């Protein structure tokens, strides 16, 4: 496919390997590694593990990008289900919507953190004012 981005790979999750019989050779709860040494979570772990199948020089970058995307989706809370259920087409509007959902989740997290910091600043201001008032009264 020239002129377009593609990612050939597989997604390994607990659902895919959890019901295979022991004779299938699936090792459970064992940390593995790829050919180039990157760690691979066990197939029954709670994290998603991505593996590329092509042999292009961009494999490492594609795997790193896929891992970062998986970590972002897992950290998004309830937005994760929206993104995970969306289609994986290369439609620009779908990709833009996915990026927007990620940005909205990050904005919500930052807004919550800002609220917490504002409360801490208000408490420190009150403590400082009471300490100054106590010092002046002595």
UniProtKB/Swiss-Prot annotation:
Residues 100-127 form a coiled coil. Its main location: virion. It comes from the Viruses. Induction: Expressed in the intermediate phase of the viral replicative cycle. The keyword Coiled coil applies. It is found in: Virion; Host nucleus. Homotrimer. Interacts with hexon protein; this interaction tethers the hexons together. Self-interacts with adjacent proteins. Interacts with kinesin light chain KLC1; this interaction leads to capsid disruption at the nuclear pore complex during virus entry into host cell. Belongs to the adenoviridae hexon-interlacing protein family. This is Hexon-interlacing protein. It comes from Human adenovirus B serotype 3. The gene is IX.
């Amino acid at each position: 496919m020239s002129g377009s981005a593609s990612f050939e790979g597989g997604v390994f999750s607990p659902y895919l390997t959890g019901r295979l019989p022991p004779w299938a050779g699936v090792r459970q709860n064992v940390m593995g590694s790829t050919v180039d040494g990157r760690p691979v979570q066990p197939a029954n772990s709670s994290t998603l593990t991505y593996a590329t199948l092509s042999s292009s020089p961009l494999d490492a970058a594609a795997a790193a990008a896929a891992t970062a995307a998986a970590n972002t989706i897992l950290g998004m809370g309830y937005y994760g289900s929206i993104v995970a259920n969306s289609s994986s087409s290369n439609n620009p509007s779908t990709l833009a919507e996915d990026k927007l959902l990620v940005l909205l989740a990050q904005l919500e997290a930052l807004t919550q953190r800002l609220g917490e910091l504002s409360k801490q600043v208000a408490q420190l201001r009150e403590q400082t004012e009471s300490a100054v008032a106590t010092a002046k009264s002595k």
